[in-house]
Design a protein with these regions (language model features):
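Radical SAM [4Fe-4S] cluster-binding motif and immediate context
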Residues: 76-206
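Glycine-rich beta-alpha loop elements in corrinoid/cobalamin-binding modules
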Residues: 1-71
Length: 206
């Protein structure tokens, strides 16, 4: 079974990562499109050495370094994650994690998002899901897994006041569970914190 490594480590250090004997290929950047193509090629027993976003070792040890594909837009085009495997292996707790954005509006030099912006220079890496799509996923999770609270894992959850105002109304109406999220000192303004509180936010991290 081929072993693939993805995430920020191979994205930021591909040359180092692909040298590891335990990996047959690595994925740079977002993986949804690359994995879909890879599985289709494997199902059809076709070569997959030319799939964008993948670096693939062939039988001779040569590494095929493919180009990256554009970032996924809109994020609503990605199906909601299937969390049933987490239940099967006992990894789903009463506090369920979810993400509404990819990227960050800031470019702090010490942060991985600064690197992501450089990797995708020429594109805007920051994307935010529409409120109805987020609420739809939350409703499904609430109905299926009955969590006690949510944890939004966005690097910065509260930065778009208009989005937050719409989210606040919809979240209170359809979800109404406490949640945790991340903010920055520059986004922790009175109006944003008020909206978070009214939506049901019980704690934040900076």
């Amino acid at each position: 079974v081929p072993i693939i490594c993805g995430g920020i480590h191979p994205t930021s250090l591909p040359e180092e990562t692909i040298k590891e004997d335990c990996f047959d290929m690595i994925c740079l950047g977002e993986g949804e499109g690359a994995m879909e193509d890879l599985l289709q090629r494997m199902r059809e027993k076709r070569s997959y050495t030319d799939i964008k976003n993948l670096w693939v070792k062939d039988a001779s040890g040569h590494v095929h370094k493919n180009l990256k594909r554009p970032v996924i837009r809109p994020l609503e085009s990605i199906p909601h994650p299937d969390k049933s495997l987490f239940v099967k292996y006992g990894a789903l707790t009463s506090r369920i994690m979810i993400m509404t954005t990819r990227g960050c509006p800031f470019a702090c030099t010490f942060c991985v998002n600064n690197f992501r912006n450089a990797v995708y220079s020429g594109e805007v890496y920051l994307r935010q899901r529409a409120v109805p799509d987020v609420i739809e996923e939350l409703i499904d999770i609430k109905k299926t897994y009955k969590p006690k609270k949510f944890r939004f894992e966005d690097d910065v959850f509260a930065f778009n006041q208009k989005w937050l105002d719409d989210f606040q109304v919809a979240y209170r109406k359809h979800i109404n569970l406490p949640f945790h999220c991340y903010v920055t000192p520059s986004t922790a303004k009175d109006e944003i914190l008020k909206s978070l509180k009214e939506a049901g936010c019980e704690s934040v991290s900076m």
